[in-house]
Amino acid sequence: MRKSIPEMMSVIPVPAWQTHDWLLHKHYAKRIPSISYAFGLYCSGNGLQGVCTFGKPASPFLCVGICGGDSSALVYELNRLVVNDSCPKNTASYFVSKSLNALPGGLIIVSYADIGMGHIGKVYQSTNWLYTGATKERTDIGVDDNSHSRHYDKGLDYSLNRKLRTSKHRYVYFTGNKKEKRENRKNLNYKVLPYPKGNTRRYDASYNPDIQQTLFT
């Protein structure tokens, strides 16, 4: 009989550097975001099979906008999730759920599903996040090294080098016990909406990172 995902997999906190190969070469964004918490998905006998990272959002306005200024320090973003395609169905949902449960209580987590990449956020829907609508499409300053636009040189002219930022579905999750979740939920500034429907388009994630990494303590 085939083992269940919890029997085969374990989720363990990992140092940020252990995610870098996955994020730079396997995730479509091809860059390393702010990382405050990082988790590895380990399969018995098969090593590291995925990484999930959380960090402070690039925009301070986003932190204030979710639940107000008094709660802005509690806002973190699930900014990267990568799982090998060879993993069983529903592995990503299991990974996200276990990672969320391992975070400190009382945090406000936001994450985005990029409509331009054909994503609707099924993993967030299956792990009971709140859907709060889609961001507006906009353009940002394009930086040649693929770093975030907040790192641009203010002394240079970027008027001809702007990049389209496609609309993204926005999801919010509250960590902790019922009281902590209730306190943060009442401060949510966005209306909770029905989950969007549709099919998810896959991107090329064929790169094979080092899966034999182990956690050093």
Feature locations, PLM:
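Short amphipathic alpha-helix that is part of the acyltransferase structural core
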Residues: M1-S34
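Acyl-donor binding region in acyl/amide transferases
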Residues: S10-V14, G55-K163, Y173
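Conserved beta-hairpin
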Residues: L23, S36-K56
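Extracellular structured ligand-interaction cores
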Residues: S36-A38, S126, K168-R170
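A conserved mid-domain beta-alpha-beta active-site/ligand-binding segment of alpha/beta enzyme cores
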Residues: Y158-R185
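Short, cationic low-complexity segments
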Residues: E183-T217
